[in-house]
Amino acid sequence: MRHTLPIAPQFYVTAPQPCPYLDGRMERKLFTALQGESADKLNDSLSQQGFRRSQNVLYRPSCAECSACLSARIDVSEFAPSRSQKRTIKRNHDLARRATSPWASEEQYELFRSYLDSRHADGGMADMDVFEFAAMIEETPIRSRVVEYKNQDSGALIGVSLTDVLSDGLSMVYSFYAPDMTKRSMGTYMILDHIEIAREAGLPYVYLGYWVPGSQKMGYKSKFSGLEVYIGGNWQKVRNPSEFTAETHPLSTDPIAEQVANIQLPDTRPTR
């Protein structure tokens, strides 16, 4: 029987642009397309190596002179809520969670716009229209869910997370919430709830995206016990977040060719 081996993913690098997290720095990303029958395997493999998904693209920071962005995940078995996090859970007891297929709605887009206008008005997604929003939610070649959080009494949509289901955990691709309900700490609450979802499903990790030491926008991620970051090809436990800094070093980043050569691709050869 004749078999055709799949084409190996091709990796590319974006042009440098201003970093959205650290002033005065430039960011650059290494990326590849996510498509075909082996998309799930590729997404699983590269997610475990610090990559993130955006629609049908997988990317990882590959800045020329900076390695401050650290891919972060929570080891569910090592997590225990702090007193503050327990209070956050209690404050949101009136919310109902609903996980659905990745379909966008006008209600979601209205919440998304409110969130962006309040929190990220100068960000790269600030001009996203309803069609681009729908593409962000719906264009997924892998198993994804939209997790909605609504007030049980009023039915108002309070928070949304676009979540990928990996072989070893949940990946919170993008989350947004009502910006005027600061006392709810919805960003933290949705992570706490995803930890519980993963625990119930027997999945060991919750992938959070990137933690950037020195960035106030990302500081909340370091407050979760069981946190791990991807450094030098390995996941390392974060015992003391203050030990991690955003300082640059001339030897802190490997050349692009070396980074690509060290990426472990899944075995996608046909088994039949």
Curated annotation (Swiss-Prot):
<dbReference type="Pfam" id="PF04376">
    <property type="entry name" value="ATE_N"/>
</dbReference>
<dbReference type="GO" id="GO:0071596">
    <property type="term" value="P:ubiquitin-dependent protein catabolic process via the N-end rule pathway"/>
</dbReference>
<dbReference type="GO" id="GO:0005737">
    <property type="term" value="C:cytoplasm"/>
</dbReference>
<dbReference type="GO" id="GO:0004057">
    <property type="term" value="F:arginyl-tRNA--protein transferase activity"/>
</dbReference>
<dbReference type="GO" id="GO:0008914">
    <property type="term" value="F:leucyl-tRNA--protein transferase activity"/>
</dbReference>
<dbReference type="InterPro" id="IPR017138">
    <property type="entry name" value="Asp_Glu_LeuTrfase"/>
</dbReference>
<keyword id="KW-0012">Acyltransferase</keyword>
<dbReference type="InterPro" id="IPR030700">
    <property type="entry name" value="N-end_Aminoacyl_Trfase"/>
</dbReference>
<dbReference type="Pfam" id="PF04377">
    <property type="entry name" value="ATE_C"/>
</dbReference>
<comment type="similarity">
    <text>Belongs to the R-transferase family. Bpt subfamily.</text>
</comment>
<protein>
    <recommendedName>
        <fullName>Aspartate/glutamate leucyltransferase</fullName>
        <ecNumber>2.3.2.29</ecNumber>
    </recommendedName>
</protein>
<dbReference type="InterPro" id="IPR007471">
    <property type="entry name" value="N-end_Aminoacyl_Trfase_N"/>
</dbReference>
<keyword id="KW-0808">Transferase</keyword>
<dbReference type="InterPro" id="IPR016181">
    <property type="entry name" value="Acyl_CoA_acyltransferase"/>
</dbReference>
<dbReference type="InterPro" id="IPR007472">
    <property type="entry name" value="N-end_Aminoacyl_Trfase_C"/>
</dbReference>
<comment type="function">
    <text>Functions in the N-end rule pathway of protein degradation where it conjugates Leu from its aminoacyl-tRNA to the N-termini of proteins containing an N-terminal aspartate or glutamate.</text>
</comment>
<keyword id="KW-0963">Cytoplasm</keyword>
